[in-house]
Curated annotation (Swiss-Prot):
It comes from Cutibacterium acnes (strain DSM 16379 / KPA171202). GO terms for cellular component: cytoplasm. It catalyses: tRNA(His) + L-histidine + ATP = L-histidyl-tRNA(His) + AMP + diphosphate + H(+). PANTHER family: HISTIDINE--TRNA LIGASE, HISTIDYL-TRNA SYNTHETASE. Keywords: Aminoacyl-tRNA synthetase, ATP-binding, Cytoplasm, Ligase, Nucleotide-binding, Protein biosynthesis. The keyword Lipid metabolism does not apply. GO terms for molecular function: ATP binding; histidine-tRNA ligase activity. This is Histidine--tRNA ligase. Its EC number is 6.1.1.21. It comes from the Bacteria. PROSITE patterns: AA_TRNA_LIGASE_II. Its main location: cytoplasm.
């Protein structure tokens, strides 16, 4: 058989890495549920008509079809199915289909795989897991949710920092109305074209962006310079407002965006000082978000790009009679974890869940070991029974190779009694008598821990 090669862009973790992901997922789920977000799971496929509404994603959609499809199938392209490339499209459909059974504002979290047929590279995958939170209203959605949503995600990321040693994060925020109003105030008829060039600011620099605006969009030197100047503005307080006004552009939409952005930044930084930065060069997503837009970077690992982004949709979903506005944030879980795990910067303290290996005296006495294991499991202690009744030295070596910290030795059976059981910490060599109905491992050994080497 030919040697198997891994498929690029479809990351798979060894058990120790998967346990790290599971641990991170539990933290996210606990945090989201503490804030009242309900879990949902949507199907993997959606009609192509829905998936291709975002034109720029067309080439990245995986189409689903049967290998031996009916050659006479006359379905049009819109009736074909594809794998979802994010969780927003299926969520919008879910809201429309279940609106009569949901109570609004509806708060949901969703941790699920998505698929994109893009060229694999570090930080970009063809199959990956996202963790999304959204709050959706019926007809209206109060602005305070633009504050609440990032605070919930920041709370989850702070737990990853304090409990697992993840770097701290900074959330950058802009507002679609601010940027669009500024460009319209300059007399620019196509603000989206400007946003597409400004989106390259970090990659090519301000001078190159200015040149693109002049050469490709025929902006005047003065207008191009002001667009670049706007993109350079950042602050954690309201000083960004004065800096924008110094550029001398007047527009009602601009003022609305400034006020809204200021309220969001002030409220978030009051709760978690310094975690949110008004960053007016954020352009990605402003072509479909209608208000606030977020991007999040790991401190000291900015080269990874945004690991968490989102924003407000004034029309997340609509059935013609009802409009459902929403605000949400998506954490790229695989994008966050895969590079870290591959570099060994985060790992599990052991590669198996078991805290105890129950040794087997003889194969004839295996039932005794199984009874002990059942007693331990009934009290929430993960354990497994040795696969063979080898010499105890070999059974200890088996536990050591699997990273299991304790070995349980059943007492030897005699004609009318059985010796006391003992349990050994194979790291220290300490061995004590123990009762499976009462003994507990140290709390830190009960479940695998996560070790960071950042």
């Amino acid at each position: 058989m030919a040697r198997l090669k891994p498929l690029s862009g479809f990351p798979e973790f060894l058990p120790s890495g998967q346990m790290v992901e599971n641990h991170v997922t539990r933290i996210l789920e606990e945090t989201f549920e503490l804030h009242g977000f309900a879990p949902i799971r949507t199907r993997a496929v959606e009609p192509m008509e829905q998936l291709t509404r975002k034109g720029e994603i067309d080439k990245e959609v995986y189409v689903v079809d049967r290998l031996h499809a009916d050659p006479h199938d006359t379905r049009s392209g819109k009736d074909r199915l594809g794998l979802h490339f994010d969780l927003t499209v299926p969520f919008a459909r879910y809201v429309l289909e279940n609106a009569g059974h949901l109570y609004f504002p509806f708060r949901r979290y969703q941790i699920q795989k998505v698929w994109r047929g893009e060229r694999p590279q570090e930080g970009r995958y063809r199959e990956f897991t996202q963790a999304d939170i959204d709050i959706v209203g019926d007809q209206t959605l109060a602005e305070h949710h633009d504050v609440e949503t990032p605070l919930v995600m920041l709370s989850a990321l702070e737990r990853l920092h304090t409990e697992l040693g993840f770097p701290t994060v900074t959330m950058h925020v802009n507002n679609r109305k601010l940027s669009e109003g500024f460009y319209r105030g300059l007399g620019i008829a196509d603000p989206m074209a400007v946003l597409q060039r400004v989106d390259k600011y970090d990659k090519i620099g301000p001078d190159a962006v200015r040149k693109l605006l002049v050469d490709e969009l025929n902006l005047s030197d003065d207008a191009a310079a002001k667009c670049v100047a706007l993109a350079s503005i950042q602050s954690t307080d309201d000083s960004f407002i004065a800096k924008v006004r110094e550029l001398g552009v007047a527009n009602d939409m601009l003022e609305e965006g400034l006020d809204s952005l200021n309220r969001v930044v002030a409220a978030v930084n009051k709760a978690v000082p310094g975690r949110m930065v008004a960053n007016l060069k954020i352009a990605r997503g402003l072509d479909y978000y209608t208000g606030t837009v977020y991007e999040t970077e790991l401190t000291g690992h900015e080269s990874m790009g945004s690991v968490c982004s989102g924003g407000r949709y004034e029309s997340l979903a609509s059935d013609g009679k009802h409009v459902y506005p929403g605000v949400g944030i998506s954490l790229g879980l695989t994008r966050l974890l895969a590079p870290i795990l591959s570099r060994g910067e985060l790992s599990s303290s052991r590669s198996v869940p078991s805290a105890v290996l129950v040794a087997v005296n003889t194969e004839e006495d295996r039932a005794t070991s199984e009874v002990i294991a059942s007693a331990l499991r009934s009290r929430g202690i993960p354990c497994e029974v040795a696969p063979k009744a080898d010499k105890f030295g070999k059974q200890i070596k088996h536990a050591d190779r699997r990273g299991i910290p304790f070995v349980w030795f059943p007492g030897v059976k005699h004609a009318d009694y059985r010796d006391a059981d003992t349990v050994k910490d194979i790291r220290s060599g300490d061995q004590v008598e123990a009762d499976a109905g009462a003994w507990n491992p140290p709390t830190e050994d009960l479940h695998p821990g996560v070790i960071g080497t950042w």
